[in-house]
Amino acid sequence: MSFFAVLLALVIEQFKPLPRKNRVLEALQSWIAWSARNFDAGQSRHAWVVWLMAVVVPTLLTAIVYNALRHYRVLLALALNVGLLYLTLGFRQFSHHFTAIRDALDRGDEHEARRLLAEWQDMDAVDLPRTELLRHVIEHSLLAAHRHVFGVFFWFVVLSALGLGPAGAVFYRMAYLTSRFVAARLQGSEGMGHETLMDLSNRLFVKLDHVPARLTAFGFAVVGNFEEAVNGWRRDAPLWKHANEGIKIGRAHV
């Protein structure tokens, strides 16, 4: 059932991709913000409570609902699998950005390519030379592919094998959203509580992304130059704030 769920979700997403900003994402961000606002009181244990509320509670609810549906009617469980995978596997949420930039470069329109990159990543790309432009496009595309596809798929498979259905996909997506949302929205806030929450959410996401990141890099290495990929991992991992990102990018530079 897991295979068909992934296949159906990807097919649906090809024909009806979710926009980058959508109501589901807004609802999840509101849930994370509510958890932080109501449970983060400035101490380490409060940061744990926020993370458990924001990430683990939706994961447990997904597992409970899935198992209830599976015992009642298998098709309903399959529908839940497909629906949640559709919401968490966001291949088309970033692929059109890459395609548009690639097409602009193929036309020789570097100005348009820079504009599209700046729009995609909210960065200043006006003065980027062509080599740097290409590097940024490759890096961001690879990271997006991992976060929207490979990482979600890994945790879906792991927890699905344990009988928890799409709980793994929800787990990875909520952990990623929590780490990014907290860093983006609370970084400038006063109080040590927010800093503690940011540190915890980032640290936990790095840990749960440890294996998927290396599997993603290994997969690219298999179809490329394995020896150069390993050297790239060793060279680039220490240069990034999160080593997982450096490992994936190290493969992209090969």
Describe these PLM feature segments:
Residues 1-253:
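Hydrophobic N-terminal alpha-helices or hydrophobic patches in metabolic proteins across all domains
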